[in-house]
């Protein structure tokens, strides 16, 4: 099971919507995930296999952190374009 954290500025709205999209996409791919949403300040201290966020927050993470930068918090098609290849690679489906 992959531990995924979705990140936005406040950890309430956008990251929650993104978490729900990530869970649905992973389910459609048959990939088990444990996803949570959080704010950008708390995200750095979280342990996760993958952090999913937008480009505005990519620089808060230490080098070597596994990131998936998505173009949208809400548009499933755009999220899939960025996330599906990463999920497949991490789960060994590629």
Describe each PLM feature range.
Residues 35, 48-54:
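Short, hydrophobic beta-strand segments that form beta-sheet elements in well-ordered domains
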Residues 69-94:
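Ser/Thr/Gly-rich flexible loops in soluble cytosolic domains mediating phosphotransfer, phosphorylation
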Residues 40, 52-59:
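Short, polar loop motifs at secondary-structure junctions
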Residues 2-39:
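Conserved active-site segments centered on acidic
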Residues 51, 63-71:
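Active-site regions of enzymes building and remodeling cell-envelope glycoconjugates
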Residues 13, 59-60:
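Short glycine-rich, flexible loops that bind phosphorylated cofactors or substrates
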